[in-house]
Amino acid sequence: MKAQELREKSVEELNTELLNLLREQFNLRMQAASGQLQQTHLLKQVRRNVARVKTLLTEKAGV
């Protein structure tokens, strides 16, 4: 997910995206814990995407 794509989204869309990413992160962690996750790089990607969305939400809030 590119930062430019995220910058074009509204705050509501970013919040929805954040919830989806957190759900995905939870599912990936459960798969990793049970030994089912083959593509471990996805954990890192999702974690960084969560950080990107949170950063943009903070920027848009003007804090």
UniProtKB/Swiss-Prot annotation:
UniProt KW Ribosomal protein keyword: yes
Disulfide bonds: none
InterPro entries on file: Ribosomal_protein_uL29 (IPR050063), Ribosomal_uL29 (IPR001854), Ribosomal_uL29_CS (IPR018254), Ribosomal_uL29_sf (IPR036049)
GO molecular function, one term: structural constituent of ribosome
Pfam families: Ribosomal_L29
Keyword line: Ribonucleoprotein, Ribosomal protein
CDD domains in alphabetical order: Ribosomal_L29_HIP (cd00427)
Gene3D superfamilies membership: 6.10.140.1970
GO CC, one annotated term: cytosolic large ribosomal subunit
UniProt cross-references to NCBIfam families, sorted A to Z: L29 (TIGR00012)
Stated family: Belongs to the universal ribosomal protein uL29 family.
Official protein name in the record: Large ribosomal subunit protein uL29
Protein's organism: Serratia proteamaculans (strain 568)
Lineage of origin: Bacteria, Pseudomonadati, Pseudomonadota, Gammaproteobacteria, Enterobacterales
